[in-house]
């Protein structure tokens, strides 16, 4: 007899919460199902009711993290505010959440490593989906005339690629996840300001003098 759906989902959550702690502390290779069971406060056999192997636990946890980041970015996309506000909130949900996760656990980066054999596919797919979200926001802003991508020689796709690549690069200079979040916000606002459609220049303000 299968357990009630609510019980199965609750067990699934408890196992993945525990797995995040032990994978983050010891890394995938050093973590055992016994470690996960001990952290979860359940028997190892109970884990096998939800997952066939440690590999499945790892993949499910990576998928949960990626889905939460995407859900946060999707919600931010529809928030009130300017294009810069939306994209800054989206970057906070995607890159900021990732930075917060790895800052708390020495090995947590494995879970969202696009080169890890167990999570590469789903991480790559999630990254593409996030890039499409960013692209769509930029395309909408260009369509309304808020942004001028043409003058910069960009499409919405290439602008999204540039914004995301720049955000990744900022991680190497940030001293903390909080600093990274601040850098992300600044990056978005600087890029959007640079792409914003400008009105034709008006008369020179009184008292202004051009300097060489």
Language-model segments: which ranges?
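Short amphipathic alpha-helix in the helical subdomain of ABC transporter nucleotide-binding domains
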Residues: 8, 83, 152-160, 180, ...
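Amphipathic, non-transmembrane alpha-helical scaffold segments
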Residues: 8, 58, 62, 66, ...
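Basic, helix-initiating cap at the start of DNA-binding domains
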Residues: 1-26, 30-42, 55-59, 78
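Key DNA-contact positions within bacterial/archaeal DNA-binding proteins
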Residues: 45
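C-terminal peripheral helix-coil segments that are non-catalytic and often amphipathic
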Residues: 1-2, 89, 96, 100, ...
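Short secondary-structure transition hinges
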Residues: 89-136, 146-153, 172
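Base-recognition residues in the alpha-helical recognition helix of bacterial helix-turn-helix
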Residues: 24, 48-52, 60, 64
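Hydrophobic alpha-helical connector segments
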Residues: 60, 74-103, 156, 160
